Amino acid sequence: MKLLIAGGGTGGHVFPALAIAQEWLSRGAEREVVLVGTQRGIEMKLVPAAGLPLETIRVAGLKGKGGTRLVKNLAMLGSGLSDAFGVLKRHSPAVAFGVGGYAAGPMLLAAWMKGIPNVIFEPNAEPGLTNKVLARLAKRIATGYEISARAWGEKAAVTGCPVRPEFFTIPAHAAGKPFRLLVTGGSQGALPINRTFVEAAALLAARKSELQIVHQTGERDYNHVRAAYAREEIQAEVLPFLTNMAERFAWADAIVCRAGAITAAEVAAAGRAAVFIPFGRATDSHQLRNAQEMSNAGAGRLISESELTAVRLTREIFFLLDQPREIEAMARKARSLARPGAAREIVNLIEAAARPGGKSGPANGQRDAVGT
């Protein structure tokens, strides 16, 4: 039985896809999987590296586009749908699973039109545009947060976000000196975070003997950030990209990071305190909602991009330095939110959708059966 997993673009889409693929394949030698993305996404590196087959389709985003770019991207929808039908013809999957990202839309629409059952995954507290549309076509919806599940009623199940297993084996936090701070803005880095740390370096230098920093910058800002720490003689390891993220989480006392759903889930799985700086222009402000959920639960602190300054950032870091009990409380609360069975629960939903009688779509006369 073959599972098709559609979506990608960022690690936040691809890592859950890989976790689901691994769980699916672990359930029997007869299981097969194929992943579908685009040629521009990080899946082009991560999926082959995991030893899994990858197909690509032509597609581009629509939200936030205008003028000639919007016209061009609209024209690509037809090409993407044509490519998607080709993928279905080559692989004949029993069920399709969408993890979000540009490829998920046309791929799951094509699957639905062919009567292949769909399951989608919405990791964020605020659902994205693609999943808002695909939810009408899906048999089941797996969500990362209770708040996003409410909109879809009984069709939705709160599973949590699939996280790589090594995050769950990280030992409980044990304080040490100097204070170990991990800074990460995702696979490409985060310009506002990098820029603010550069500006804050002179302020952080006042307590540099108490600090040890690992800062993942992305390629673009690497030299600039490294020079700022060196100028102030702050003990910092600056890297464009981190390949051993679970080990870095285990090392850290606290993490400064974005608030993508998978990042938040990794913070929870690792049981670490965090300062979340959500992407200010993320579609539908989903990162802000994720950060609010974690902050409201006592599992992290929140700085919005509009409030992000060198002074505010330094104040948050010095607060953590001075409040070891707060660090421990946030770490415990974060780990209490972890969902180690997320991949298993999602694959259970996929299997249920794939059982006889589980098909949907126009080929089975059920075009409007969802959400009515």
Could you describe each region identified by the protein language model?
Residues 114, 250-252, 268-277, 297:
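Conserved donor-binding/catalytic loop of nucleotide-activated donor transferases
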Residues 83-97, 103-119, 132-136:
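Glycosyltransferases and closely related glycan-assembly transferases
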Residues 41, 46, 50, 172-255, ...:
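Donor-nucleotide binding loops and adjacent catalytic segments primarily
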Residues 3-8, 30-76, 219-221, 306:
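Conserved nucleotide-sugar phosphate-binding/catalytic loop shared by glycosyltransferases and other
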Residues 112-170:
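Active-site-proximal region of nucleotide-activated glycan assembly enzymes
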Residues 319, 339-372:
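C-terminal alpha-helical cap of glycosyltransferases
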Residues 93-95, 250-265, 272-273, 318:
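Acidic donor-binding loop of glycosyltransferase active sites
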Residues 326-340:
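A short, well-ordered alpha-helix in the C-terminal region of glycosyltransferases
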